[in-house]
Amino acid sequence: VVIFPLGLDRNCLPIEMAAEKKYNVSPFDVGREEFLKYCESPLHLYLHIPYCPKLCWYCICNLKITSDRKEIQFFLDHLLKEIDNLRDFYEKNDRTSAIREIHFGGGTPSHLDRLQFANLCGHIRSMAYDISEWAVEVDPRTVNEADLLFYASEGVTRISFGIQDFDPGVQKAINREQPPELIEALLSP
């Protein structure tokens, strides 16, 4: 879970600030104090889903290739605990969540099944009440029209398709083959 103030450099995260300041307290305490400074300003929540069904050879993302649903669920269970901890943090510090934007990236968040995705969204909604944008990156090879409608029903307002190139030769070279017809079908009403 990565949270940063909207409009600030996204590399400016509390843990990095804590490391630079060399406090004589635990990083958690420093992170908490730094976060309290920003937690009522509009915030952006980024959730990294590090799983993909297939490796694209150009990819430098932190990811794991797997179709093991138990492994993905194990990760998701821990991510949900992190979200619960954040919600509890707001409550214990008598604060209201100022999360205004949410972005799921990866890997590919579309590698989550619908139940997993809905559970994740429900946990987020338990602490984020005024979301202006909810974005999800998807691998167009892993979704269909029904999936896109499902994402919308969960509150997603923007979908980014991972289209790297339309040239079949380039697609083959990067191990990301997706015919233009596939994209056209997803974008056509």
Residue map of PLM features:
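Local cysteine-cluster metal-coordination motifs and their immediate loop/turn environment
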Residues: L47-L63
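Flexible, acidic/Gly-rich N-terminal and inter-domain linker regions that tether
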Residues: V1-Y46, P53-K54, N93-T96
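Conserved non-cysteine loop/helix-boundary elements of the Radical SAM core domain that shape
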Residues: L63-F89, I99-P189
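Generic recognition of cysteine residues
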Residues: C12, C39, C59-C61, C121
